[in-house]
Design a protein with these regions (language model features):
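Juxtamembrane helix-capping/reentrant segments at transmembrane boundaries
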Residues: 73-93
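Transmembrane alpha-helix/helix-exit interface in multi-pass inner-membrane proteins
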Residues: 129-154
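The first (N-terminal) embedded transmembrane alpha-helix
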Residues: 15-37
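Loop-to-helix transition at the N-terminal end of transmembrane alpha-helices
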Residues: 41-59
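Membrane-proximal soluble regions of multi-pass membrane proteins
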Residues: 147-149, 153-193
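Hydrophobic alpha-helical transmembrane segments of multi-pass integral membrane proteins
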Residues: 24-29, 87-104, 178-182, 217
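Pore domain of cation channels
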Residues: 175, 179-182, 190-231
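Alpha-helical transmembrane segments and their membrane-interface junctions
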Residues: 94-115, 181-197
């Protein structure tokens, strides 16, 4: 095995190990939250565990990004992130999972007291917005990996990064979070230029997924609020 192939194999293995550790930690905290709420209904316990797991996973990512400067971002981005297709599948899965989790709540909402209604409303909205945030954090990390990838896609110059930032400083994770969340909210970024063909395709998928996600979220939020605060409750 060549040195380059061995390096790629090691990097790929470390990605799976890091992701497995994060998922296990998030799942453990979610399971603890589920287990410590035996008096709640099953749907409520599932959604509470889901929220805690999502918050734990996001916290682990933010904690790592907060301690990373530009050099650390370059070195670490390839160790915690995967290919385009895995990112898209993960983002779509997370979006659907949050909506499914909220759907568990809707068919039982009219049997709750006002206090429990407010509690479940908070759980439902937290699930939606935590998942929305995680989807775009995942895309931001993916943009960092594509930017610092030492082997660019075929046909693209190796000496020109796929993103052009307005200053001459090396971008860190927060620069890529800015890019990802601005795309998610505004569908465009005025001060960062996209110069890579492969990255344009990822951005297109990101924007389309974001639009679909926001459309579904708005529909679910209206349904949740309308169901939970209905005068017939």
């Amino acid at each position: 095995m060549s040195l380059e192939a061995r390096f790629k194999h090691t990097t790929r293995s470390s990605r799976w190990m890091v992701m497995f550790a994060r998922l296990m930690s998030a799942g453990l905290f979610g399971a603890v939250a589920f287990g410590l709420s035996p008096r709640l209904e099953l749907e409520s316990r599932i959604l509470l565990g889901f929220d805690v797991a999502m918050l734990t996973y996001i916290g682990s990512l933010v904690w790592r990004m907060a301690a990373a400067d530009a050099v650390s971002t370059r070195d670490e981005s390839g160790k915690i992130e995967f290919s385009n297709w895995i990112v898209l599948l993960l983002a779509g899965f997370l979006s659907g999972l949050s909506l499914l989790a909220v759907g568990l709540m809707l068919h039982r909402s009219r049997s709750w007291s006002p206090l429990m209604t407010n509690f479940h409303l908070g759980l439902s909205l937290a699930a939606v917005f935590l998942t929305w945030g995680l989807v775009h954090i995942v895309f931001g990390i993916h943009y960092a990996r594509m930017y610092y990838d030492p082997t660019p896609p075929a046909g693209e110059p190796a000496d020109r990064p796929p993103l052009e930032f307005p200053d001459d400083l090396m971008p860190d994770f927060w620069d890529f979070m800015y890019f990802a969340f601005t795309l998610a909210i505004c569908y465009q970024v005025s001060d960062i230029s996209i110069r890579g063909r492969q990255l344009r395709r990822v951005v297109l998928a990101h924007v389309l997924l974001s639009f679909l996600n926001v459309t579904l979220i708005l529909g679910f939020v209206v349904e949740i609020v309308g169901t939970f605060i209905s005068p017939t409750n």
